[in-house]
Structures are given as C-alpha cells and as structure tokens.
Amino acid sequence: MFKKSNKEPQLDAFASVPMMLESSALKQYSDQGHWHNQFHDQVVMRIDETIFSILFNNTTGAPNSPIRTLVGMMILKESFVWSDSQLFEHCRFNLLVRSALGLFNMNDPLPVESTYYLLRKRIYDHQKQTGEDLMGKAFAQITSEQIKEFDVNGRSIRMDSKLIGSNIALFSRYEIIHQTLCMFFKTLDNVEKSTLSLADLEQLEKLATEEPLKTIYRSTREEVRSRLQPIGIISYKLLTLFGNLQNESFLLLRRVFNEQYKVSEDQQIELRLKEEISSSSVQSPHDPDSAYRNKGDQKVKGFSVNITETCSEEGLNLITNVLVEKANIPDTAFVEPAIQATIEVTGQIVEKAYADGAYQSPANDKCCENIDMVFTGIQGAESRYDLEMTPKGLQVTDIKTGECIQAVLVRKQENSKEDRWRIGTPNGYYYFGQQAIRTSTMRREMKGRSLEELHKRNNVEASIFQLGFPLRNNKSKYRGQIKQKMWACCRCLWINFVRILNFTKQLCQRTFKTTFLLVMAPFCSGYLEHRI
C-alpha cells in the first residue's frame, strides 16, 4: 500500500549535520541560495509522490524509501553525468548532495541500490504496459508549480529538436537478422526444441555459435546475401511452429522477418530489396524502438528529442515540454502536442511560437490557427515566382523579370479537391497548387519580419546544447524510447533548476542594490546640499 513520505523530517540532536560543522562550513551549508538548498526546495519538495502511487498496491507493498528522494537521485545522476556507483558514493558521503535530497541527519538512511533500480523498472514496465508516462507527468507537475511561483510568461514559446543516437552498435542487415533469430532460439526450452527437426536444430545451433561480424568480414557481398536465404526459411518455420508463444523475442523475430523478407504466392521466401525496407525498421535487436534518419550530413540510428520553452524578453524562461520519438518522425509531428502540453503546464494561451522551417506543414494550420507562427526559414529552394491571391484570382510575379501575370484557373486533378492555376511560359505551362501558394505566402511573411524577431528562436539552441552536453558523439547511454524520455525529462528538470538558481541570484542582487540606494539616498542628498 502506497504511503506519502513526511515532508518535514525531524532533526536528530546528535546526528544533525549543522551541529557538526564549523562556522564557515555551516554558513555555506545553511545558505538558502546555495544550489543544494535550492534543489531541495525547487525540485525535490515539488515532486508529487501520488503520481507514482499506481506502482504500489497491496501485492507490491509500500515503497521502502521516499519516492521524492529516489526521483531526486535520478535527476542528480543525469545532471552531473554520474555512473550509478558515483551516484551512490555522492549520496552517502557528500553532505551537499544529501542535503539536496532531504537527508539532513548523518544517520538518515539512503535508499539501497535494489530499491532505486526497482522503482526505475516499475516506471519502465508501467509505461510499456499502459503507455502512461509517469516521469513526463512529474516533469509537467514540477514545471507547472515553478511557472506559477516565478510568474513565467508562457504566451510566447520557441521549439527545436535534436537527433540522439541509441546505445547500439551499427549493425549490418545480416547481423540484425542473424542476432534476432538467435535471440529467439535461445529462449526456447528443451521441450520446445524437441519439436524441431534434427536438420533445423543443427542449423540453429550452428548459427547460435557463429559470430556474424566475422562472417561478414571474411565473406563477399554475394556470399552474405546467399546466407540470408536459408536464415529466412528457418525463421519462417519457427514463426509457423511457435506462433502460440507471442513473447517479446517472438514478436521481434516476426517483425524483423516481415521487414526483411516477403512470402510469395507459392509460399517461397524472398529477400526484400534494400529500397523496400523502411527507415523505421529494426536497427538493432537490442533496441527495437530506434529508427534510422539521414539529416544533412548526420546519420542517426536512434531518436529525436523536441524541446519547447517559454520565450519572454523579461523574467524567467523555462522548458515546458520535452518529447521523444523515433528518429524518422518529422519535426512537424511535434508542433500540436508540444503546444497543447505547454498550454496545460503554463495555464496560458500560446499567442506566438518561434520555430525553424522544418516545423511548418499544412497539417498544423488548424491547431495553429490563432497562433502567430514565426518560422525562421522555409524548407526547399525559393521559387522564381511570387504568388498572391487577390479578388481577381492568383497574381503571379516573376521575381527574375518583375513581370506580373494573372494566372488562369484550370481543371482540378483527378481525385483532388484543390484548385490549380497556370501561367504560360516560353517552355510551356507552369502550374501552381495550394501548397505552392501557401509556401509563397509564408516566405513573404518571413521577409516582412525584423531580424531581431527572427533571431529569437536561436536561443532555444542553447537549451538543445545543454540537453546534449553530456553525450559522447551524440549517443545516449540508454536504449529504448522510454529510457530516453526518462533521461530527457531529468536533463530538462536540471536545466530549469539552473535557470531558477541564476534568476534568484540576479533577483537578490537587484533587490540589494535597490534597497541600498533607497537607504543611502537621503544621506547623499543632504551631503550634496551641505557641499553646495
């Protein structure tokens, strides 16, 4: 049964840390503006433990340690880029870290490793089974309280995305198929293996002992391709024979088989052409969630992380939403959920949003109907013709010659409801559709905006940099979309905390300066009058 932890733990008269420190150390330890005290107040104490209550019932029992302490440990781990052993070392012996987590007495027990890992596992399993993102809910709840306390203006936002590689090796097609088959074969028990023919069993046992990387190294492309055919046949036999299993390894084998092979009408197994394989296909059997994307000169097998933050010229700006999807998901898919999540977190209507050209799409026009979308660029080369709808119809301006032409409305294309226009050119007719008109309108709007307004989006790149700062070669140390989202939420909570810490320091400095001037003003004026 879930129980809330005590928000006000008692200090031990003999084990309290402040009782053991000398004056200078005590001054820093007790400084409410220092990071450890601010982290405890702004992050740890804001964690609503009831969000995680669904993980505990009469069967699983109550949590052994406070949930807010465990979640705080997760955030600190990703913030300081610690390993698990470093995390527990700091939590045991670093007084500032212990204070940040609410462990104010020397004898306050730290959650043991098994308790920490069990909570992470339960969060992961719960999201995998139900789709409910508990860490995402905790992030939204903490950020919402911070926004209310510091009166953050959420009517103007900006967003950007980053591709992050999963913690997987770059597997070839042969390695993906081979390892997926072997992973399933190793899950079979002796009774299930006894249903296989002797020839099939020998083939599978031989494949299980093979090192696919060495096979690729010493084989030609044709030899590797020829080896894929019998692997496809034996995979199909296993899928047919053990169709009632439906476990994780079976579902993965079936997915890889359908992505890499096809069954002809005469029940022949055929290897798919490279062009037929989707970018969302399995990139590694060790991380089926990851996907492939080639963006400019960056090739990634992993995920795309989208960050949305407030964009106010005055006051504090915080990250309001973080989304993690497969790498091949376009940025346009982030717009609507990011805006809706920001509205829920801030409790304010979004009036203006800054983004680059990758976010613009006709599919988002409806959800952004009352929002001023400021795009800093448009994908694709600029057209030679500027298009503008007038009461008389479509007016086309040749940018190269300056000539204005009235376009003619033509018959719609088959199975299409969109109007089309055309103009005559020396090379024949030139046609324009709704997409071309929309793009031209957006380019005209973008050119009409000031450079200062267009540059406001650039600051979100600093948030993207801070998010990915601990990554090596833009690769995460985690696998799977759920774990990547947990990592991203922890990083964004830390980024928000650092902003709050810096903001409160500046606020204190300004308050001190203002108070000093108010106090000294009468004395200064009297001194000046006396001198005159």
Which role does the model predict for each range below?
Residues 86, 91, 105, 109, ...:
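Anion-binding and metal-coordination hotspots
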Residues 51-57, 99-106:
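Short amphipathic helix-turn modules centered on a small-residue break
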Residues 32-72:
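Basic, short loop/linker segments at the boundary and entry of helix-turn-helix/winged-helix-like folds
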Residues 60-64, 78, 484:
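Short, solvent-exposed segments of well-ordered alpha helices
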Residues 71-81:
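Alpha-helical support elements that line or immediately flank enzyme active sites
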Residues 1-32:
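N-terminal intrinsically disordered, low-complexity, charged/polar
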Residues 95-97:
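General structural concept
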